[in-house]
Design a protein with these regions (language model features):
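Terminal presequence/propeptide segments associated with secretion/organelle targeting
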Residues: 1-545
Length: 545
């Protein structure tokens, strides 16, 4: 059976190609089928099925039957799988809310598996979505490309990416076969994902013929795109494209379709990154972007943007220390501060970018409407010195102490080139303190945060207040911390510590799902310094009656 299809081969003009339906693959998924067809005409004999063709409409006798959605990698013939239009237009089945991934940056583990159909030694797979990135360093793209490819996205460095530009005069109505670019980030760095429009019904737009991320209900702007050139490849050819004028917002990203609405504005998050050199002359580079507020995609975009900004303005190999000062803007509430220092001989930008993206992921994946991320502001200062001190020793002024008395704890830190620094803290043993061993641990910020991180993973915050408290209490490592504790257990229920419970209540909770940990008696923040403190040591002092 003969059929025709529509797609863009050059510029913004929709061209036609021919096809021959070979048959129908039934039950390739739950109530899903795939129409198998051989494509021909235009450049397809040379290029085969291209990335960016996803969603190209196919007609039989003038009737829309489906959209190009599948291809055979490394195939010598342009054979495609066509998604039936009925599956694209059907209401999406109810979806369970996406849960946070164990690794918030592992897109592939967090998303539904992409559909593959085994056919002997070949595979019919969903056409990968080309992800155009502009304004990013080559190193940033190479570092994050494996994660993106695992999620079915093909990162491509280009000039167009997610930038949009207004057309000359009034733009024409959007037509089936035209190319669109889903705008994930715009500005000094930009990201756009390309596909083709299958069907337009009033203000509703249906495209791709398969999922983009499988996000379900979503909010992502999209623009018209133009094709600059076609690049044939033995693996999968693709269209080199440019984003043009804004058109509307993608509102649904389901297994069989990416659907949106024309003239609908999508909410975007403003992101500002400023990178300064600590040594004179103090040069500063600033980056301003807007990005989507997706709970899984945004942390990766933030990580890529921070890494690229650091790599573009500073060397990433060799010793460096990076100081972070910033804040996460929250809709209708006080900003959440970001403050820390990072030092390493290699890979400091990777440490910083991951550290920034982690609280962004926690905020976006919490699901609390009163803590919706509204923007991100980051100031990064880079030094070519390793300003790091290692804990060398801890001692106390007394071996034994009585209730009502004080004990001094001193810590010695050593660094490169003979750097030496001491920090002292005084703990007052309260009247009525029970006898027995009392432990004093001098530690760095990340080590002190471990117990909170464990609690966060075991019992995620049950309220916006708990999440805000968790994020604001994270300790920076520009100072050491003195933690005073006993070995008797304390209890945690729904993320809250319950110290000093009556024996009957404690016994009941010990038999429930409550979490147990050592009893933290006090924590003292020791004096800060423009250094990164690292290391942890514990000493014991005996409390006598």
């Amino acid at each position: 059976m003969s059929c025709t299809g529509k797609t863009v081969f050059r510029g913004a003009e929709v061209g036609e190609f021919r096809c021959e339906i070979l048959g129908v693959l039934e039950n390739t998924g739950p109530k899903q089928s795939v129409i198998l067809a051989r494509l021909s005409g235009g450049p397809l004999e040379e290029t085969g099925v291209m990335q960016g063709m996803s969603g190209s409409p196919v007609y039989v006798g003038g009737r829309l039957v489906g959209a190009v959605a599948y291809s055979f990698p490394f195939s010598k013939a342009p054979i495609a799988g066509i998604r039936p239009i009925e599956e694209m237009l059907a209401p999406a089945p109810p979806r369970q809310a996406r849960s946070a991934a164990t690794d918030p940056f592992d897109l592939a583990a967090s998303l539904p598996a992409r559909q593959e159909i085994e056919m002997g030694t070949s595979r019919l797979v969903e056409i990968s979505t080309p992800l155009w990135l502009s304004g990013f360093t080559r190193g940033a793209i190479e570092r994050f490309a494996p994660r993106l490819r695992a999620a079915g996205l093909e990162p491509v460095q280009g000039a167009g990416g997610g930038r949009t530009r207004p057309p000359a005069g009034s733009p024409p109505p959007l037509q089936p076969g035209e190319m669109i670019s889903v705008q994930l980030m715009t500005g000094d760095m930009s990201v756009g994902a390309d596909g083709t429009v299958t069907h337009v019904d009033g203000r509703r737009v249906y495209a791709f013929g398969h999922r983009f991320l499988g996000a379900g209900e979503t909010e992502m702007p999209f623009a018209r795109a133009e094709v600059l050139a076609l690049l044939p490849s033995l693996n999968t050819s693709f269209k080199i494209s440019n984003a043009r004028e804004w058109l509307g917002s993608i509102t649904a990203d389901n297994a069989t379709v990416v659907a949106g609405e024309l003239n609908r504005k999508a909410r975007m998050l403003p992101v500002r990154i400023r990178v300064a050199n600590a040594a004179p002359p103090r040069q500063t580079s600033s980056y301003s972007m807007e990005m989507v507020g997706d709970r899984l995609l945004t942390p990766i975009l933030v990580q890529m943007a921070v890494f690229s900004a650091l790599e573009a303005t500073q060397r990433i190999a060799g010793i460096s220390t990076i100081t972070l000062r910033g804040k996460m803007l929250v809709r209708g509430g006080e900003p959440l501060p970001l403050s820390n220092m990072y030092a390493a001989e290699l890979g400091t930008p990777n440490l910083v970018s991951a550290a920034v993206a982690a609280p962004v992921a926690a905020l976006l994946q919490s699901g609390f409407d009163s803590l919706r991320l509204a923007g991100l502001e980051l100031d990064l200062e880079v030094s070519n010195q390793k300003r790091q001190l290692q804990l060398d020793g801890v001692w106390s002024s007394k071996r034994t102490v009585r209730p009502g008395e004080s004990v001094d704890i001193t810590a010695l830190f050593l660094g490169e080139s003979g750097a030496e620094l001491t920090r002292k803290a005084t703990y007052h043993v309260p009247v009525g303190a029970p006898p027995g061993p009392l432990y004093f641990t001098v530690t760095d910020g990340p080590s002190a945060n471990l117990s909170e991180f464990r609690q966060f993973l075991l019992t995620p915050p049950r309220s916006p207040e708990q999440l805000r408290a968790f994020l604001t209490k994270l300790r920076p490592n520009d100072r050491p911390y003195l933690r005073v504790w006993r070995s008797s257990p304390t209890l945690q229920v729904q993320g809250e510590n319950l110290p000093l419970l009556p024996p009957s209540a404690g016994a009941a909770l010990l038999q429930s799902a409550a979490q147990q940990s050592n009893s933290l008696v006090a924590e003292i923040r020791m004096d800060p310094a423009p250094w990164l403190f690292s290391g942890s040591r514990t000493i014991q002092v005996e409390v006598k009656e």
